[in-house]
Amino acid sequence: MGKYKILVVTGDSLLAGSTNLVQLWLVGEHAEADLGKQLRPLRGRKTELEIDVPLHLGRLLVVKLRKHKGLLDSDWFCKWITVQGPGIQGEAFFPCYSWVQGKETIYLPEGTALKVNDDTKNLFRKYREQELEDRRNVYRWGSWKEGLILPIAGSTERDLPRNQRFMEDKDLDFSLSLAKVLKDFAIKGTLDFVSRVQHLEDYQKVFPHSKTALAGRVRDSWKEDALFGYQFLNGANPMLLRRSKRLPARLVLPPGMEDLQTQLEKELKAGSLFEADFSLLDGVKPNVIIFKQQHVAAPLVMLKLQSDGRLLPMVIQLQPPRHGCPPPLLFLPSDPPMAWLLAKIWVRSSDFQVHQLQSHLLRGHLMAEVISVATMRSLPSLHPIYKLLAPHFRYTMEINTLARNNLVSEWGIFDLVVSTGSGGHVDILQRATACLTYRSFCPPDDLADRGLLDVKSSLYARDALRLWEIISRYVGRMVELFYKNDREVKEDPELQVWCREVTEIGLLGAQDRGFPLSLESRAQLCRFVTMCIFTCTGQHASTHLGQLDWYSWIPNGPCTMRKPPPTSKNVTEGDILDALPCLQQARMQITFTKFLGRHQPVMVALGQHKEEYFSDPGARAVLKQFQEELAVMDKEIEVRNASLDLPYEYLRPSMVENSVTI
């Protein structure tokens, strides 16, 4: 009994407020009080209420909300609610960060994280069970293509749960940016139909005026072997390179190449031989664009790591050997310059395909979606792991739905301009899905498996390890707050259902590739959650942020090749130009590269989310410590980069987005 002071906070986005009346209830340990239709929430406002309650509620457990329709039904975005009880009762915090729609009743538990086994009086059991039942009806697994990890159900973004849709600022930025690049393409692209590329320098016609500093450097130095090798370490796709343990079986050296054999074996023995194998592309059916056949290769590149840290190519094989056919041609740095250049261009085009489909789309976007859908279906909002992960799912489901409908759909961007479009891209995604391993999503294991832990010139490796360690410490501290021992992990039924939902359902039974079906210890839980957060943040950033830098100069990363791989070394500049994309294709590549790679004005950096899901002081202190460690790493990278010829910023915490949003 007594007065309760209630503060209701509405979101800041354009349509966050509502003209409808909202009814509130306070649910305590002993009783429930209906406060009536007290509220008409306005955008960006904090509404204060002071109400006499004649009942003894006891400790507050839940705030209930129901929006009543007026003549017009308008949704309401509630950030959070605080309630100050009478007497010595402290202030209770009820996080919401979701839309209140229609006539549904929303239950907001008090923000202290609570595992189901810690609720010994079963005060919250019915709320968490009802929440999960409702969520499983809304967050349903869908299916896009056979053999691919599962997406959220829904044909378009309008089919998605309201809480997973873009806010108005994001939606407006996305729509205006897309309209601008399409307008530029329509205006400038008309001239491309009457223009021909006569020299490599002619690609300057489509080179963006608002280029990045690194893009300009790539344009000026793209022919250099050192920059070619550098990209495997620190470029748009640092996920393919590995140290050679033996000479690849596919590398067939014809008679007369004994010197090359000796050099390769020397580097192999010294531990300085590396390889980039694009066998994933072997046999992929190439696209036909405007009635013209495009072409795909599956190269192998052997590289040597020099004492100065430079990675230099030694030999390029553009196709694997075929039974009954002569050994494929091998290209060497000593070959005629145009032949060697064309071989490197073929590698760069192949890397474009593998990067965009395997490293970026599958391992970044689609994997993050599996984690987010499984979490929404399996962990209630009271669960500490839900509270820990929730900020890292913002906008992921909508951006992925848009990608499936516009980028890799029938008549999407890949079909219109990329050599692996019109079905080849799906084939690649299916092959890559079958190769997904748990270790490959954990940088300490992945970099060890690929032999990159001690490669000092791999700035990606150094920064990925550092970021993983910071996230791991953050997760570890959170886990220690809520799980006192391994037994508590094993006996958390919601946690075990979540783990199985990720591995067995979302990833189509990936336990045979190392993904866990259960979590048996705090250490195992920490590793799994760290993998989830790193995937949604650093993993995506490392393969997303470099697109403008490395693909703005078309010859350095052509989206398609219009001629088959060369069968002789008698190559002219005209042969190269005939193979590279025409100006229309090049401008289309630049158009979607600029759109996807642009700076996000509503970007939230890693760990900088404003949403407070935890009311626990200990958890808030852990987040603050995480932010401090990220700030230290960010400053150290800034200082390091100032002395580098080619700065590496893709895993700088201030550049890493808190979730997959573009």
Curated annotation (Swiss-Prot):
GO terms for biological process: arachidonate metabolic process; lipid oxidation; lipoxygenase pathway. Residues 114-662 form the Lipoxygenase domain. Belongs to the lipoxygenase family. Binds 1 Fe cation per subunit. Catalyzes the regio and stereo-specific incorporation of a single molecule of dioxygen into free and esterified polyunsaturated fatty acids generating lipid hydroperoxides that can be further reduced to the corresponding hydroxy species. Shows increasing catalytic activity within the series arachidonic acid < 5,8,11-eicosatrienoic acid < linoleic acid < 8,11,14-eicosatrienoic acid. Its cofactor is Fe cation. This is Polyunsaturated fatty acid (12S)/(13S)-lipoxygenase, epidermal-type. Arachidonate 12-lipoxygenase activity is decreased when the pH decreases from 7.4 to 6.0. GO terms for molecular function: arachidonate 12(S)-lipoxygenase activity; arachidonate 15-lipoxygenase activity; iron ion binding; linoleate 13S-lipoxygenase activity. It is an enzyme of class 1 (oxidoreductase). It is found in: Cytoplasm. Fe cation binds at residues 360, 365, 540, 544, 662. GO terms for cellular component: cytosol; plasma membrane. The lineage of its organism: Eukaryota, Metazoa, Chordata, Craniata, Vertebrata. It catalyses: (5Z,8Z,11Z,14Z)-eicosatetraenoate + O2 = (12S)-hydroperoxy-(5Z,8Z,10E,14Z)-eicosatetraenoate; 1-O-methyl-(9Z,12Z)-octadecadienoate + O2 = 1-O-methyl-(13S)-hydroperoxy-(9Z,11E)-octadecadienoate; (8Z,11Z,14Z)-eicosatrienoate + O2 = (12S)-hydroperoxy-(8Z,10E,14Z)-eicosatrienoate; (5Z,8Z,11Z)-eicosatrienoate + O2 = (12S)-hydroperoxy-(5Z,8Z,10E)-eicosatrienoate. Pathway: Lipid metabolism; hydroperoxy eicosatetraenoic acid biosynthesis. The keyword Lipid metabolism applies.
